[in-house]
Amino acid sequence: MPVEAGFVQRLFGTALDDLLPGMRLHVRRLGDTRRALSLGGGRIYLPRSFFEHADPHRPLRLAHPVVAGVFAHELLHQWQRLQGRAVTYEAFGLHLRAACLRRDPYQYQACADPHQMLQCFLDASVEQQGQIWQDHVQALVQGQPLACMCLIAEHVHQAQVGQTKPGQTSKD
């Protein structure tokens, strides 16, 4: 996983270093196999098409903006867990409410000001944070970085393991 490890370190600095040796990428075979899924312990399930030649023994196609963005989204869920967020529990509730109320759990309000965008990120749900990060990484891979994301990138890259908002605990 050398290609993927370099990608992780560029985006997250040392924040995921403890997780990298045990991180495993799998082809998603259950549920909606077109979608990615992140579980605790560095387990990430991705569509077969995300791997070079659709072979899960080959590297991810990280030059493709969508592949890089979705992988980054799932990596952010790993990062959130290390920050103390109960990602699986929170995401389950978000998706359940989305199904019942027809709300997009990924939708967020983008803004041009980096400070406001950072506050949006800090206040966001786990899926909104994942989508914000995905949009940031897709723009980077396309060679069109979004200036409004610079403080978010700095925050994620410099975060230390175990930093949580007051009152948050990890449940998964």
Language-model regions: role of each:
Residues 1-44, 48:
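Auxiliary, metal-adjacent structural segments of Zn-dependent hydrolase domains
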Residues 8, 71-73, 77, 130:
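Generic structural signal for small/hydrophobic residues in well-ordered secondary structure
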Residues 3, 66, 70, 129-132:
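Extracytoplasmic/secreted proteins, especially bacterial periplasmic and envelope-associated proteins
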